[in-house]
């Protein structure tokens, strides 16, 4: 007898800026950084879940029409990712706050899922993220290509008119 056990779906947003940086969230109590992402609730679309999770984990309120659908990616044995992307101007991260909490099994306290935020160069993903996330962000998604596609210009490009 076999049981079909579908993989859970986690939805999130890859937030880029034109300085070739990616917004990452530090996972509380862990050594790694991650994208704002999380599980899809019953009745939600992947886009709805990505917007909600980004808001809960960072406080950012993104507009649906600002997101580009990157698609679904194999992630772990139990989970797939559905990711979207957007480009934003680089902004001060001091105002970001994680509203999503979990019960810490050691202290018994409610802690934020994310306890820090940072803009990081694309090349730093492997040093900061888990190997599975590094595979997605480093091999399956071309961050440079996404940036060019969303902005219409290469990273760091300054038009002659803007330079004058």
Q: Model regions: which residues?
A:
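Conserved N-terminal beta-strand and adjoining loop/helix that marks the start
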Residues: 1-22
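Short, P/G- and charge-enriched loop/turn segments at secondary-structure junctions
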Residues: 1-3, 70, 103-108
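Short hydrophobic/aromatic beta-strand or adjacent loop that forms the aromatic wall/cage
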Residues: 8-12, 79-83, 114
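Conserved Nudix-box catalytic region and its N-terminal flanking loop in Nudix hydrolases
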Residues: 17-60, 164
């Amino acid at each position: 007898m076999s049981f079909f056990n579908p993989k859970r779906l986690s939805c999130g947003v890859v937030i880029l800026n034109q300085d070739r940086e990616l917004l990452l969230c530090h996972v509380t109590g862990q050594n790694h950084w991650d994208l704002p992402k999380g599980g899809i609730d019953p009745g939600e679309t992947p886009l709805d879940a990505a917007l909600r999770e980004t808001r809960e984990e960072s406080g950012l309120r993104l507009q649906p029409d600002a997101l580009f659908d990157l698609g679904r990616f194999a992630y772990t044995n139990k989970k797939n990712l559905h990711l979207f992307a957007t480009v934003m101007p680089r902004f001060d991260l001091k105002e970001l706050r994680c509203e999503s909490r979990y019960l810490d099994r050691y202290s018994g306290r409610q802690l934020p899922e994310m306890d820090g935020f940072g803009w990081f160069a694309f090349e730093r993903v492997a040093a900061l993220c888990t190997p599975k996330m590094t595979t997605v962000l480093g091999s399956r998604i071309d961050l440079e290509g996404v940036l060019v596609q969303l902005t219409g210009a290469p990273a760091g490009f300054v038009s002659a008119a803007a330079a004058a």
